[in-house]
UniProtKB/Swiss-Prot annotation:
Residues 75-308 are periplasmic. Pfam families: FtsQ_DivIB_C, POTRA_1. It comes from Bartonella bacilliformis. Coiled coil: none annotated. Keywords: Cell cycle, Cell division, Cell inner membrane, Cell membrane, Membrane, Transmembrane, Transmembrane helix. This is Cell division protein FtsQ.
């Protein structure tokens, strides 16, 4: 106690307690002001009568929706909802699909599950279809309430292309449609070599004016992506020049010796030089030719021996 009768406390002990009491008082006063401000803000708002019920309903609805989603039942729920709404795809009309099976089309478009007319994307469906090997163009239309119309323009197989040990079916532009399988296509031209797929159509069309030759062709072989060799059904090879191949063939055919040469035991006919035709005998013909020559030489020796 000091001289004035007041109790004196140690500053380093009681100062902290005093500040705590002061801060509590200030905070309580601050809380009251904030509460009073918020009360004045909402005091003028007219709360609807059923706001509480709506809040409770929203809470339960969101809880059920979360349970369906987390439990993995959303797909089934969507299927039932779409079906009950009447916008479920129930009819799919298809046209132009000769090579691509109907069930394959339904599968790649996801129409084998629970398609919705509303959510079905026709642009995406068209893109997916045009990525299929046999499809060149596709058109997809919605016909409400429950029908889709799919029209396809498929690629036409033009030839069988052999290259690098592989055999593929190509169209007339050289586009590779699919790997070759026996029985999948019939009566197609057979082209061989790098670059043959791009130039085969023009060459085969140009050669079609000479059916007496083309009917015997078994394979069109592209050599060095520069020129063509023709392999005939009898095993004969016709070697064509790099430039003016069709004109050279025309001259050869018009000379009237083609049919005669085709019936002989010849392995190669070389037309690469414009001023001559070079012919190579087959192995069998060459063997017979050598036998004939040897026999003639033997007879000649016998005649000479008899005359002596």
């Amino acid at each position: 106690m000091d001289s004035g009768g007041r109790i004196v406390y140690a500053l380093n002990v009681e100062k902290t307690g005093f500040l705590r009491i002061l801060s509590v008082t200030v905070l309580q006063r601050l809380y009251r002001r904030v509460f009073w401000f918020l009360f004045k803000c909402v005091a003028g708002i007219d709360v609807p009568r059923h706001a509480g019920s709506l809040a409770v309903f929203s809470f339960f609805f969101l809880s059920i929706l979360y349970s369906i989603s987390s439990g993995g039942y959303m797909n089934h729920f969507m299927k039932v909802a779409i079906s009950n709404s009447g916008f479920l795809v129930t009819h799919v009309d298809m046209s132009g699909n000769k090579r691509m099976m109907e069930q394959d089309i339904l599968k790649v478009l996801g129409l084998d599950e629970y398609p919705s007319m509303i959510s079905f994307d026709i642009d995406k469906a068209r893109f997916i279809l045009e990525q299929q090997p046999w499809v060149r163009l596709a058109d997809v239309q919605k016909i409400y309430p429950d029908r889709l119309r799919i029209s396809l323009v498929e690629r036409e197989p033009y030839a069988i292309w052999q290259h690098n040990g592989e055999m593929n079916i190509i169209d007339d532009t050289g586009y590779v449609i699919a790997p070759f399988q026996a029985g999948l296509v019939q009566n197609l031209s057979f082209v061989v070599g790098q670059g043959a797929q791009k130039t085969a159509k023009l060459f085969i069309q140009a050669l079609s004016v000479y059916p007496q030759l083309q009917n015997h062709v078994r394979a069109y072989v592209r050599v060095g992506d520069r020129r063509w060799d023709l392999f005939l059904a009898n095993g004969m090879r016709i070697m064509l020049p790099e430039n003016g191949a069709i004109e050279r063939l025309a001259s050869f055919i018009e000379q009237g010796v083609a049919e005669d040469l085709f019936s002989r035991d010849i392995s190669d006919i070389d037309l690469r030089l414009s001023d001559r035709i070079t012919v190579s005998l087959s192995d069998e013909a060459l063997t017979r030719r050598r036998a004939v020559v040897l026999e003639e030489e033997r007879l000649l020796k016998m005649l000479k021996a008899g005359s002596v």
